[in-house]
Every structure is written in structure tokens, then in C-alpha cells.
A protein has these predicted regions:
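Active-site-proximal, well-structured secondary-structure segments within enzyme catalytic domains
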Residues: 132, 136, 202-203, 209, ...
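Catalytic Zn2+-binding segment of zinc metalloproteases
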Residues: 336-337, 540-552
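Divalent metal-coordination and catalytic microenvironments
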Residues: 28, 152, 219, 335, ...
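N-terminal helix-rich structural modules
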Residues: 1-178, 183, 187-191, 202-203, ...
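C-terminal amphipathic alpha-helical interaction region
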Residues: 695-752
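A conserved hydrophobic secondary-structure block that centers on an alpha-helix together
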Residues: 148-159, 215-226, 310-322, 329, ...
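Active-site recognition of the HExxH zinc-binding catalytic motif
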Residues: 527-546, 569, 680
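C-terminal substrate/ligand-recognition segments
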Residues: 536, 613-631, 651, 655, ...
Length: 752
């Protein structure tokens, strides 16, 4: 694609990037081993310091410098598994990811390093540290505690109390004397205090059957047990995601079986080897979603939906069960009732009951709307079945949802998505999007010609702040699908924008990876409007990565509370529903004409279409996630089916196992999928309070947004960012109105 109009000339190499993408499989393996050795040396040096020797420079700054180097190199080695066209390189990258994940666990469990960090905290008492350095030190201590490294003191206390009791000194004699033994109650009290640390249930334990040292041995071995679990978890998460990325399942259909799909879609499909004029349809997004929205053959949609929600069913179902059980074990060892409780401690929500109340309250508000929408869909289905002489089963099936939701847009809002996409060719959308972001955030983007990347389709841009002349970083755009590539849309932070040890700033680097329809000889890549929305969303994450100006790598970019991380990019989705921005990124791919005003107005009104069902499905996914991480024995498929019926009112297809395809469960969103809805409360408040009131293209508001929300990264709490940008505590009103709901009291989040 061409650079946006008015772009500055390209420079040959990006400033500050430490990344390279020409590594072969053996080079990746070798570099991973070297990175581990180099980083371990730093940790060994810190761990060997005497108490009197620890200082900000040789402890805090040394660890920060090692973390920065490790983060950049690790990203360079494990990112290729998601994007490399070479299976060998992807495999080596996955191996490196597993090796480095194991090392991550090792470093997180360094008792010696944790001890030096706590010594430093006691020594400095925060007085001599800058605010972000103090936050970094406190976070290191907190992460150590969340790995159980603080338990050594409890271990010593338990040992002292157990050894002091007569019961512990002579268990065989004590058993014959029953409850009359002096010290027995003290020993039992000690046991009850530490029991949650190793996850034992209630009741009278056979604490002493193995001898005096048994209980103390269990407690002292906790860090090692936690370490083992964390290593297993990291490998399982990698395997879960890899299985989905590498899945190459396809179905073969005749043109008749694909009835209703446009010619440009059909002509883009490969022919199936089995012959008979059949076409290959994969389970990747660019094939799955268009088919589910437009194919009027129910049996075709049914086959696709069944296979899509059965991807990697056997292997990922086993992995998922292990994940939830191991997470529960680890959290119990650390004294948490559930894994969800462990995770939420670091989020805005803080507690499971807060999340449950939020989801229940929103579901109750949305259910009446969902019932109305289901009635409309059922009516559309009955009418179509009569017109096409198809049997009407009187129900909405999972494979009916997207098809009839699309029909709602077409019939009730007169929005023809096939016609609309002709106005969204990739080149025009990209130029418009980049122009809008530049104007809004006060930035300039320059495309780098002949830049090194992992595939010829990938393009690189440099981002500068014209006000200061500073280069903030670079971003890659990898927008089209290919075999073995990450199957969804996501932003990958590759190099943190933060301070180097010498005080200079390392520029940030990020990649947006997506799977939009590839161009053909007959037509360019044409985007559905929801794909334009996805583009805006993920690019919002890119801007978060590049605009943050944290001092430490740990706080760079999107390293904020997980239930706030989506808010900045969700807020920017609003621009694809506003008239002026839409006109800037939409022109007919043949005539160059803008979207007709009438069609544009219909599109904007259609934002309310299906909002009840869409958000109820989000609640289903969030509740499944919460259920699995609060009740690890729950069956994922059964839990999903139950919630689909109870919350959404649409049954899951028997035999499928959607949770086995739910990448978020292994991708860092465990017990946190609720965050998509939770974040939207804040994103809508930010948009309607500032941009809608002062101008959606206001450079002043855009700069405030960049400085208050994007610039801090995770160096301050999200609550503080929101207060600074909004000028008041956030409210839920804009969120409820955006869903077509009445504004009123409820259990939606209040950050302050």
C-alpha cells in the first residue's frame, strides 16, 4: 500500500530497533540459549549480594536493564511462531517460547533475588526513589509474593511452633493420649493457619503420621511446587494456541451449497482436490464469517458451525482441563480460594463478587432486549423457510445466529453489507485510518520502503511527534491470512518504549496482525464494516504501545490492569460509526465515489442492531471463563451449553466444544474475559464525555487522550488516568445508552 498523502520521505533504517526477522531455526535455538545464560548471570549477581551491598543501582536498575534486554530478545524469538511462513521457523520459535517460558518461571521463583529486593525496599523505604521507580520496586515485591516467595518466613514460624509442641515431638505417644497431650492444640492451630497455603481440605488431618517434619516439609516445599505448576502451565498455554494456529481443517462445498455468497468470495476460493467442482472453505475468519452471514443454505452453515466449534476439540479439551486444574492448585497453594480470586487481586474489579454482580446486572438489563431480538430473528427464519420451501423447526440454532443477525441489518436498517464493502477497499481504509490517527493524536507516520520483515506482505511505518521531532517508534502491518499464521486479529508489542540504562529512550515497536480478505486479480481486498471496526480497534492497541512513555519496560504500552487494557482501543472504535471519519476512509473501489449519505446514515443507525444478543453472548463467554476458574471441576462444554441456554436463549450445538477453541483461556485472559465489557464502561464514558462533546476530530482532546490515557502506560493506576482525562469519576451512563438501555443504578463498575 502507498504511504498516506503528505508522508515524509522514507529513511533506510528505523532508529532504535533491536529486532531482526531473518533468523533461521538454528539461530533461534542458539539465541534462546544465549539469552537465558546472559539473563541468569544478572540474577545470579543480584542474588549473591550481601545485605549491606544492595542498592538501587546494583539491584533495582540491574534487574530493570536485564528485563528490558530480555523482553526485546524474547519477543524477537517467540513472535515468529505466530507469523513466519516457514513451518521450521515456527516450530523453532515455539520451542524457544517453551524454553524461555520455563526460564520465566525460574526467574520468578528466585528466592535469593526476592530477598535482595525486600532488603532494598527496607533500606530505601521509598524515600529516595522517583514515583515510577518506587512503583516498580513495589511491583517486584508483589510479584514475588504472588509466587509464594514470601512464605519462607511463615515456614520458619510453623517449624518453630510445631517443634515446640509435645504432639510434634512424640506423635506415636501423643496419639495414645488423645486430646490430653500438651501442645496438640497449638500444633493443630499452626496447621490450620498454613493449610490454605498447600490447598488441603478441611477435617482432621493425619498431620503427624509421617513424622514430626512432615508438615514443615510440605510448607517449605511450596515454592518448588508452585514453580513446577507454573512451568506446566506455560507449556500447556503454548500448545493450546499452537493447535489453533496450525489447524488446517477445511470443508468442500459446491457453488450451490454456497448459495447467497457473492461472486468475489467464491472466486477467491481454491478448488478442492476431490474434484466435482467443489471449493475449499477453511475455518479461518475470512472464510468462516462471510459464509455464516450470507449463505442461505442451512445445512452448509450447520456443517461449518459444527466444525468451527470443534476445532482441536480432543487435544485442547484435555489441555483446558489441565489448565484450570493446575491454576486452581497454584492459587490454593498461595492461599486464594479460587484462581479467579488470585487473578482479580491485580485488576480494577479486585473481587469475584464484583465481577459476578457486574455480569448479572448487565445480563438482567439486556435480557428483555435479547428476547425481542430473538423474536424478530425467529420471524425472519419462518418467513424465509416458507419462501424457500425449507422445513421450519421453530427454534434459533447456533448456525442461524450470524445469518439472521445480518438479515436484521438488511431488513430493519436497509444495510447491505455486500454493497457497503465496495466502499471499503483496503488501501482507502488504511490511508484514511492512518490519516485520522495522525490528526487526532498529533503524530506523523512514514512508510519505510524495502524494510526487513518476516513476509513480503508486511509493511513498516515509523511514528514521529512533529511537535518535538522525537521518533516514538515503529509499527508493522501484517493484514492478510496465510498458512500457519495466527488466526485472529491482535496487536503484538515487540519492543517496549522505555528508558535505557544510560537515560536515553528506546523506541517502541509493535505489530498489528490480522486476517482480512486477500486481494484478487479481479478486485482489491474489500473489508466488511465490522472488519474496519476491528482494524480501528487493534490499531488503537498499536498506538497505546507507541505513545506510552514509561520509564520501565514493565509499565510500557498496554501493561495496564487487564480489565482496563481494552478501553483505549475500544474508545477508538467509535470513529467507524461517525460520519466525518467514515467519509475519510471510504471510497468505492471502482468509481472512487464516497458512500452515499443515505447509506451512511443507515449504517450509523444500524449500530443498535442486535446489541442485546451480541452482548449477551459476551456475557456467556465471560461467565464460562469465570465458572471454569472458580469451579475447576466444571465441564467446559456443559458449562458453555448451560449458559448459552440460560443467558443467550440459543442452544449450543450438541457435540461441539466451543471452550476448546476459546483462545483467550490460554492467551492471558484467564478469569478476565469480563474485561471486554468492563472496559467498555470506561471507553464509552471517555468518548461521549470528551470527544462527542468537544469534537470527534478535536486535536486538543486527542492530545489530552494521548497524554492522559496512552502516555502513562501502566506507570499509574487506571483510575488516576480516567480522573485526569474525564475531570471526574467515571460513570456507566454512556455505556448503558450505547446498548440502548435505560440509565439507572446498578452493579456496573465504579472505579472510584
Amino acid at each position: 500500500m502507498a504511504p498516506p498523502t503528505g508522508s515524509a520521505p522514507a529513511s533506510p533504517t528505523p532508529r532504535g530497533s533491536r529486532l531482526r526477522w531473518d533468523l533461521g531455526a538454528e539461530q533461534i535455538r542458539s539465541a534462546a540459549a544465549q539469552l537465558v545464560a546472559r539473563t541468569r548471570q544478572v540474577y545470579d549477581a543480584v542474588g549473591a549480594l550481601e545485605r549491606r551491598e544492595v542498592s538501587e543501582q546494583n539491584t533495582l536498575r540491574a534487574l530493570a536493564a536485564a528485563e528490558l534486554d530480555y523482553t526485546v530478545q524474547r519477543n524477537m524469538l517467540d513472535f515468529p511462531q505466530h507469523v513466519s511462513p516457514s513451518r521450521e521457523v515456527r516450530s523453532a520459535s515455539t520451542e524457544a517460547d517453551k524454553q524461555l517460558s520455563e526460564f520465566d518461571v525460574e526467574t520468578s521463583m528466585r528466592q535469593d533475588v526476592y530477598q535482595r529486593i525486600t532488603w532494598l525496599q527496607e533500606k530505601l523505604d521509598g524515600a529516595s526513589l522517583k514515583p515510577e521507580a518506587k512503583r516498580y520496586l513495589e511491583r517486584l515485591v508483589k510479584l514475588g509474593q504472588r509466587s509464594g516467595l514470601h512464605l519462607s518466613r511463615e515456614v520458619q514460624e510453623v517449624r518453630r511452633r510445631l517443634s515446640a509442641s509435645d504432639w510434634a515431638k512424640s506423635p506415636s505417644r501423643a496419639r495414645t493420649r488423645g486430646r490430653t497431650v500438651p501442645g496438640r492444640e497449638a500444633a493443630q492451630a499452626a496447621f490450620k493457619e498454613v493449610r490454605p497455603l498447600w490447598g488441603l481440605g478441611g477435617g482432621e488431618p493425619d498431620l503427624w503420621g509421617g513424622g514430626r517434619g512432615w508438615a514443615a516439609h510440605i510448607v517449605s516445599s511450596l515454592p518448588q511446587k508452585i514453580k513446577e505448576i507454573k512451568k506446566k502451565l506455560s507449556v500447556l498455554c503454548i500448545d493450546f494456541s499452537k493447535n489453533l494456529n496450525e489447524d488446517a481443517t477445511f470443508l468442500a462445498f459446491t457453488r450451490e451449497e454456497l448459495g447467497g455468497l457473492p461472486e468475489d468470495f467464491l472466486s477467491s476460493l481454491e478448488k478442492a482436490e476431490e474434484g466435482g467442482g467443489k471449493l475449499k472453505v477453511t475455518l479461518k475468519y475470512p472464510h468462516y464469517f462471510p459464509l455464516m452471514k450470507k449463505c442461505h443454505v442451512p445445512e452448509t452453515r450447520k456443517r461449518m458451525e459444527e466444525r468451527f466449534n470443534s476445532r482441536c476439540k480432543e487435544e485442547n479439551c484435555r489441555i483446558l482441563q489441565q489448565l484450570v486444574e493446575l491454576r486452581a492448585q497454584k492459587s490454593a497453594l498461595l492461599g486464594f480460594e479460587t484462581h479467579a480470586a488470585f487473578v482479580l487481586e491485580m485488576n480494577m474489579a479486585k473481587e469475584c463478587k464484583t465481577v459476578a454482580a457486574f455480569l448479572d446486572d448487565l445480563a438482567a438489563k439486556l435480557k428483555p432486549l435479547g428476547e425481542k431480538e430473538r423474536a424478530v430473528i425467529l420471524g425472519l427464519k419462518q418467513r424465509e423457510c416458507e419462501q424457500r420451501a425449507l422445513p421450519f423447526d421453530g427454534r434459533i440454532n447456533a448456525w442461524d445466529m450470524r445469518y439472521y443477525m445480518n438479515q436484521v441489518e438488511e431488513t430493519q436498517y436497509s444495510v447491505d453489507q455486500n454493497l457497503l464493502k465496495e466502499f471499503f477497499p483496503m488501501q482507502v481504509v488504511t490511508d484514511g485510518l492512518l490519516g485520522i490517527y495522525q490528526e487526532l493524536l498529533g503524530l506523523t507516520f512514514r512508510r519505510e520502503e524495502d524494510a526487513q520483515a518476516w513476509h513480503e506482505d508486511v509493511q513498516l511505518y515509523t511514528v514521529q511527534d512533529p511537535a518535538s521531532g522525537e521518533t516514538l517508534g515503529q509499527f508493522y502491518l501484517d493484514l492478510y491470512p496465510r498458512e500457519g499464521k495466527y488466526g485472529h486479529a491482535a496487536c503484538f508489542g515487540l519492543q517496549p518504549g522505555c528508558l535505557l540504562p544510560d537515560g536515553s529512550r528506546l523506541t517502541a515497536v509493535a505489530a498489528m496482525v490480522a486476517n482480512f480478505t486477500k486481494p484478487t486479480q479481479e478486485a482489491p481486498s474489500l473489508l466488511q464494516h465490522d472488519e474496519v471496526e476491528t482494524y480501528f480497534h487493534e490499531f488503537g492497541h498499536v498506538m497505546h504501545q507507541l505513545c506510552s512513555q514509561a520509564d520501565f519496560a514493565m509499565f510500557s504500552g498496554t501493561h495496564v490492569e487487564r480489565d482496563f487494557v481494552e478501553a483505549p482501543s475500544q474508545m477508538l472504535e467509535n470513529w467507524v460509526w461517525e460520519k466525518v471519519p467514515l467519509q475519510r476512509m471510504a471510497r468505492h473501489y471502482k468509481t472512487g465515489e464516497h458512500i452515499p449519505s443515505e447509506l451512511l446514515e443507515k449504517l450509523i443507525r444500524s449500530r443498535q442492531a442486535n446489541t442485546g444478543l451480541f452482548n449477551l453472548r459476551q456475557i456467556v463467554l465471560a461467565k464460562v471463563d469465570q465458572a471454569l476458574h472458580r469451579q475447576p471441576k466444571a465441564d467446559p462444554a456443559e458449562e458453555y451449553a448451560r449458559l448459552c441456554q440460560e443467558v443467550l436463549g440459543v442452544p449450543a450445538t450438541p457435540g461441539t466444544n466451543m471452550p476448546a477453541t476459546f483462545g483467550h483461556l490460554a492467551g492471558g485472559y484467564d478469569a478476565q474475559y469480563y474485561g471486554y465489557l468492563w472496559s467498555e464502561v470506561y471507553s464509552m464514558d471517555m468518548f461521549y464525555t470528551r470527544f462527542k462533546q468537544e469534537g470527534v476530530m478535536s486535536p486538543k482532546v486527542g492530545l489530552d487522550y494521548r497524554n492522559c490515557i496512552l502516555r502513562p502506560g501502566g506507570s499509574v493506576d487506571a483510575v488516576e488516568m480516567l480522573l485526569q482525562f474525564l475531570g471526574r469519576p467515571p460513570t456507566q451512563d454512556a455505556f448503558l445508552e450505547s446498548k440502548g438501555l435505560a440509565v439507572g443504578p446498578g452493579s456496573l463498575p465504579s472505579a472510584c
